[in-house]
Amino acid sequence: MKSKNFKLSPSGRLAASLAIIFVSLNAYGNGIVPDAGHQGPDVSAVNGGTQVINIVTPNNEGISHNQYQDFNVGKPGAVFNNALEAGQSQLAGHLNANSNLNGQAASLILNEVVSRNPSFLLGQQEVFGIAAEYVLSNPNGITCDGCGFINTSRSSLVVGNPLFENGQLKGYSTLNNTNLLSLGKNGLNTTGLLDLIAPRIDSRGKITAAEISAFTGQNTFSQHFDILSSQKPVSALDSYFFGSMQSGRIRIINTAEGSGVKLAGKFTADNDLSVKADNIQTDSQVRYDSYDKDGSENYQNYRGGITVNNSGSSQTLTKTELKGKNITLVASSHNQIKASDLMGDDITLQGADLTIDGKQLQQKETDIDNRWFYSWKYDVTKEKEQIQQIGSQIDAKNNATLTATKGDVTLDAAKINAGNNLAINANKDIHINGLVEKESRSENGNKRNHTSRLESGSWSNSHQTETLKASELTAGKDLGLDAQGSITAQGAKLHANENVLVNAKDNINLNVQKTNNDKTVTDNHVMWGGIGGGQNKNNNNQQQVSHATQLTADGQLLLAADNNVNITGSQVKGNQGAFVKTTQGDVVIDNALSETISKIDERTGTAFNITKSSHKNETNKQTSTGSELISDAQLTVVSGNDVNVIGSLIKSADKLGIHSLGDINVKSAQQVTKIDDEKTSLAITGHAKEVEDKQYSAGFHITHTTNKNTSTETEQANSTISGANVDLQANKDVTFAGSDLKTTAGNASITGDNVAFVSTENKKQTDNTDTTISGGFSYTGGVDKVGSKADFQYDKQHTQTEVTKNRGSQTEVAGDLTITANKDLLHEGASHHVEGRYQESGENIQHLAVNDSETSKTDSLNVGIDVGVNLDYSGVTKPVKKAIEDGVNTTKPGNNTDLTKKVTARDAIANLANLSNLETPNVGVEVGIKGGGSQQSQTDSQAVSTSINAGKIDIDSNNKLHDQGTHYQSTQEGISLTANTHTSEATLDKHQTTFHETKGGGQIGVSTKTGSDITVAIKGEGQTTDNALMETKAKGSQFTSNGDISINVGENAHYEGAQFDAQKGKTVINAGGDLTLAQATDTHSESQSNVNGSANLKVGTTPESKDYGGGFNAGTTHHSKEQTTAKVGTITGSQGIELNAGHNLTLQGTHLSSEQDIALNATNKVDLQSASSEHTEKGNNLSGGVQAGFGKKMTDDASSVNGLGSAQFAIGKQDEKSVSREGGTINNSGNLTINGNSVHLQGAQVNSKDTQLTSQSGDIEITSAQSTDYKNNWGTDIGFNGKKTNNTPKEVTEEKPATSIHNIGGKLLVNVEDQQKTSHQNATLETGTLTINSNKDLTLSGANVTADSVTGNVGGSLNIASQKESDRHVTVGVNVGYNHTNDPKSSQVNKTAKAGGSLLEKTIKDTIDSGIKSSTDAISDKYNSLSSTIADKTGISDETKAKIDQGFGKVGNGIKNIVTGAEGHTANADIKVTHVDNDAVTKTTSLTSNNDLSLNVNGSTKLTGAEIVSQQGQVDLGGSSVKLENIEGHHYEAGADLDLKSSVVDLAKQLVGGDISFKSPVKTNETVNTKASISEK
């Protein structure tokens, strides 16, 4: 048969409830109804309704088994008569003895309900007489609400059946039963033991007993309620204990599989409190309250209204409390402690899963205030909400044990405190978290026509704040966490007064828990409907907060995991020591990042709500919170794989050991800030003012600007490893990246395959764009002209920048630092400060530099357009104004007029009628455009070298040692470097700029006066410029030692600009191959180029004339410069210098200085080279232009045609180069030894006590350092101009002839500079005893050697020669001009005569003619005298002199004709020529000895312009043949300088005044010979 489920309507549910109530009342009314059988007791009632039951006769075991059809106890109660004699009952008064007992009182009164009716117990039940155990057995269910038991040693309520066997009570059964034992709010009270036995229990009230045992489920029990067996129910049989219990002992057991026990209330046990079930949940009760209140002023009508309301809701919580001496909650499945408090001596919580968490409470409040009146409105709604977390708290005076037998232990906002030990164990994971509390406030409103500004709009403000209610675990002694899976703590606080042990089979995660704060402000409104402007705002701020986990132990701390240990943004500390270990995973000490995001979106409107300004910004900022692993004693970290420390601290007050089977990485953490910002503004300006006399201007200008800026900034948060002593050991690599290593008392050691100290970058990148768009209009008016002008301008500038600052790794070691790399060792911008010994070793060692840099790039663009229209009528208004003013002036006092006369209107009109110079008004239009763009960039970089500062430095490389500007400094002892090869490069600081610009513009103008004439003018120009600059500054490595400097290299050693300074010791460098000390080089290069051009065109036409003109100009220039400057190395050693090379020893311009001996040794060649610097400059230019014009004019009397033109062309070239060489220096107070197969000293400056030069198989050469200069520059500038005018009268007559007048001219400029120069810096050697042993030749070329005595052997020849210095220099400058005209007005006489006016013109002309005759006579006399002098000095022949006289005669006549007639030919010349040719010895090579000079020369001796001198002794060359050769040279300098004035009249003045003189063009010409000689005393 199928069953059907029916759903009741609300009315049906109400009817069913009433029926149940009536049935219950009826049952109460039946009371206790005995069964009709022989087990039915006698039941009677006494006054007040109390029922008295005379129990049946007990059996041999003292059990009185009573059976009932109904068993219900009302409030008057019931009395079970177990008395053998009469007495007084507490409930029923006087009672007689129970006759059924037969003299034997019952020890157990068993009341069994044999019907199907449940029992309702509302009152007390008393055992009258002898106390006995009480059992009520009703399988149909029992309800107790205010029931209790009197004079019972044990009271048991059993929803089940008694089990009898052979008439004997064996126990009880709740099998196959699902009925309920219900305890109401009025509870249950007894002084004895209490048993509650049922498949299900629902308790809502207070239960008080000596001991309480509650067993649920489907079970069989013994007579004394021991569980014998259980069966799995078909459905869950959950029990609820929502009241309270108070007892000496409380036991709650639910055996039903899949069922649970739920506890809510207060449970107090003097001794044990235990709960056992499949599922256990302790929960607290939440009370809900709400309110809703309207304002007293509320109203609504057609004119307005007020709505005020205050409403809210709240939740309050009554926490569940479990108190007992020993508290045990054991669940087969899930065990949940929710918002409850447990207090006891020892507390044990167990479940397959164990959860201890909290409960959330919500509080809400809303205030509404809405008001309106006609068109005015103002509405505000305020809301407040609070989310509160109520966590669980466990307090154990002794120990607390939390166990998950199958799954996880989860703690959320739990506070657990154990007076002794706290142990948490999980078969899987342990999770320790906090719960987030929130508080939010908001205000939302809108308004219309509010205040005098008539504001209309809406606004909204909200603010949300989150706080963390963290889990807290505290142990008075030890704290232990053990998980077969992972252990994760977030934002938790864990502390033990003694030791902490955290052990996980998988991972240990100590992390942060994050909360968020949020604030939003919006405001959108307008004034006067937008006419008065407006404002928009939408701003938001979001802030993330990281809450660290804190794990601390006053004793020792142990973290152990098979896989990973992850500590993120948290603090771990063991006061008496700490140990962190992974078997196969990583140890990660990491930082946590918190993020703050702020957004701004604002706008302000001006009239008509046009946007006046706006601002948008979004800022995203990260903040790093580093982890801390600290011990006040020893700290050890052991990893089965890698150790990663990121932006965090590991610190030990004692020894710190980090051991890894993989890598050890100590890195900085990055925190990034990103900003995106945009601003706009609109400005409107106007003006109205007088700009000239009676001229006025008015106009406006609008400017809109936009600024967009984005930036990204990356900052590094370094890690630090610190301990009294530090030991880092990795089976693989060790890397420090932008982080620190410190020891406070002792040594530090680092060991790995590869070891690296590298830098990280702090970087900021910006991108900025400024855009301006502007335009305007202006109007000008007044008595002279009217006009208008419109303009538009667009400007944009885009700038990008990047700034990079390196954060190098650093060490600060109080003792010794030992770094051992099985393979390679790398330093990049690292800094080491070691009080003791710095020792490092590896296969390859690199000490490299990094570069801080700043770069910027700017692009700009601008475009402008102007349009103007003007009407100029000043040609009319100004004469009119003057005529009126002249008439007025005639009546003023002081004028020769009749003062009584007044100016009348007729007089003024008469003056105006006489005006004849009025001009036609001019109308014109002008349009101009201009624009341009540029690109500019700049890059600067500064090298940051690795530095090592220690008491003593030992470097040992099995292969390569590589330095880049490294700084070595030993403060106590010496520096020792050992490698197979050693390369030391100089670092470079760089500065670089580039600039490119293109700009141009054009203008067109059109004007007319009559409408039949028109003038058009067009012009344009453009230019492109390119500039570039590049500079580098070199910095070599520095070796500074308080003791010795010892460098031993198996093969080649190369040092670039290096500085060696052994302040109290000796500098020794040994190389098995080449040893090179090369110069470093600074560089400078720049270039500039320019291309420009312009053009113009003008056309004018009238009915009478035509005018045309135009032209163009163009040019280009380019200039470049390259320069290198030598930066040489230095070597000092107070106790001496020793350089030994297994092959070549090369020193390039190096400076050596010592107070003791210096030894330079090479198996092959010792080469002291000079340092070299160069300068190169090149350029060229090319330009030219042409202008031409043509005009024609017709009048009534004549016609004229004119034309003009000009042209100019320039070209030039610059080519210069100089090479400067400078030798090195050797200064020592001890002896100097130079020993090699061959020896070469170039330009060296040597000063020593005694010197020994030895070549084992080659030559010894001491030579000068040669420098050169080269110039090849030239330029030419050519110009031409001409003009011609033809004038033809309408009727050509002798008085009015046709004329043709011209004026032509030109110029030529030429500049030439050519130079080739060679100079020498002689090598110098000053010493006491000089010993020279050369296996082959000895050569001194450009050298000066001075010694007290000279001895030695020369296996070959002795060659001593001086060096010539040469300078060939030619400079030519020519400036020539020429002009010719046939214009009579250009006559010098006519010009002067006409200056006196027509009356004096003839007199002045006659006087000038007479003066000219006297002047020419004087010139002739002067010439005759001068020519005779020149002829005498130069030896000119008579024939030649005659020709010159004839020429000067023609010149004289020409001068006269030019002065008295048309100006004709004019010319000027300025010519300068300089020629220098020097080729001679300026510094003689010499070998000088104060005493004897004794050289055993096997070959010949040759002196070329050189000297051998023995000042106090003899010269002995061992019988060598001597050849002396002189060097011939010369010094030559010549020049010519001619300056002729630009006109013949000026030339005549020169001749008359004697200003022209002729000198010999040769200034110097001499022969300079340098003789070779040998001199002795």
Curated annotation (Swiss-Prot):
Where does the record place it? Cell outer membrane
> Signal sequence: where?
1-29
List where Basic and acidic residues composition bias occurs. 437-446
Q: Where is this region: Disordered?
A: 437-467, 1081-1103, 1169-1188, 1213-1232
One Pfam family from the record? TPS
Q: What does this protein do?
A: Bacterial hemolysins are exotoxins that attack blood cell membranes and cause cell rupture by mechanisms not clearly defined.
Q: What is the name attached to this protein's record?
A: Hemolysin
Tell me the lineage of the source organism: Bacteria, Pseudomonadati, Pseudomonadota, Gammaproteobacteria, Enterobacterales
Q: Which gene encodes it?
A: hpmA
